[in-house]
């Protein structure tokens, strides 16, 4: 049953990539190290996945969304529509270069950590960065010596601080 009033404690969610699931590498990592991070499997196109996310977070404010690749695109789109509900975004090689994405008219004010791999050929930093800068007012960028999967950079992030 959903709460009668939106929650005020931060609630963290992991949004997986297009070809991944909650049981992928990052999902398993969260299950082991931060089991309170909520996740589910998303299916369909961007709008269908956003509708699934809307259902998942119904009645919850103070959201921390960590999204990988297409999940990062989902997090950015959700934040553009509901910026008042966002505490923080952690965008991991987000697919902001996909044609489905347009920066919001008013940049999202919540803190955003954008982590990209310098060797990412799926979501190259030179294509993602301009859209990120147009989308987020409080943006921190980390470009790591990594590829799209961010297997080295991902576990090295300060997750205890990011998830509070």
Question: Where does each model-flagged region fall?
Answer:
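Active-site catalytic motif of lipid deacylating hydrolases and related acyltransferases
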Residues: 2, 6-61
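Short beta-strand immediately N-terminal to the catalytic nucleophile in serine-hydrolase-like folds
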Residues: 65-67, 92
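Gly/Ala-rich beta-loop-alpha elbow adjacent to hydrolase catalytic centers
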Residues: 67-76
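A conserved short beta-strand
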Residues: 84-97
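Short beta-strand/loop motif that positions the catalytic acidic residue
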Residues: 108, 113-116, 120
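Catalytic histidine neighborhood in serine/cysteine hydrolases
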Residues: 133-150
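Post-His helix in hydrolase/transferase enzymes
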Residues: 151-164
């Amino acid at each position: 049953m959903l709460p009668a009033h939106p929650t005020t404690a931060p609630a963290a969610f992991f949004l997986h990539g297009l070809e991944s699931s909650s049981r992928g590498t990052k999902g398993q990592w969260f299950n082991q190290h931060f089991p309170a991070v909520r996740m589910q499997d998303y299916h369909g196109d961007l709008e269908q996945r956003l509708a699934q996310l809307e259902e998942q977070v119904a009645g919850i404010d103070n959201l921390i969304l960590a999204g990988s690749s297409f999940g990062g695109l989902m997090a950015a789109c959700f934040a553009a529509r509901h910026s008042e509900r966002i505490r923080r975004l952690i965008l991991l090689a987000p697919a902001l270069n996909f044609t489905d994405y347009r920066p919001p008219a008013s940049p999202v004010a919540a803190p955003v950590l954008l982590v990209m791999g310098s060797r990412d050929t799926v979501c190259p930093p030179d294509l993602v960065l301009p859209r990120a800068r147009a989308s987020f007012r409080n943006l921190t960028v980390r470009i790591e010596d990594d590829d799209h999967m961010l297997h080295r950079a991902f576990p090295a992030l300060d997750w205890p601080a990011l998830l509070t």
